[in-house]
Amino acid sequence: MMTLLQSAALAEAQTGLKINDLFEGRIIPQERMIETRVRGKTLAKYQLSYYRSVRFTVGESEADRVLKMVEDDSKGHFATGGKSRKTVFGKEHSVNFKTQVGRQGDRNCFLCYQAWWRGNTSEREVTVIYMEGSVKSLEQLEELLNND
């Protein structure tokens, strides 16, 4: 019974966000994604209570579609501190976007997007992360993660 309740709570974590469709396999099929879910004491030092990520490889247009979903969510949910960065190191390219996307009860919610590719290929390795916790801001979260 407890597992069923935990599963229901996890399923609702991104409710109301466009990116929820990605996590539920409606944009990229589940079998093409590597998913990680963490809840509990292992996240306490980061002041987080829930972490969920998906990683997958897609073409440029699909990667751009997922980034737009993350950006749209950042606009529609009391977003603060959105940060975007595009980096080129020789033939390696990456796009990063991080934002706070409102609250779930008494927890702040955060979204991160990263796409990486080499050279002129249209294939992108994409990671999207959703996090919840008592951490107050994106800046504080970055500080906690960087001090590990």
What do these predicted regions represent?
Residues T121-D148:
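C-terminal partner/receptor-binding element of secreted or periplasmic proteins
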Residues K98, C109-A115, T127-I129:
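Short, hydrophobic/aromatic-rich beta-strand segments within well-structured domains
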Residues T15-K18, P29-R32, R85-G102, R107-C109, ...:
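A structural motif
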Residues M1-I19:
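Bacterial Sec-dependent N-terminal signal peptides
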Residues S61, A115-R118, S134:
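Solvent-exposed coil/turn segments that connect beta secondary-structure elements
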Residues V54-N108:
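Mature extracytoplasmic domains of secretory-pathway proteins
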Residues V101-R103, Q114-G119:
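Short, low-complexity Ser/Thr-rich regulatory SLiMs
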Residues T15-D64:
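Early exported N-terminus immediately downstream of N-terminal targeting peptides
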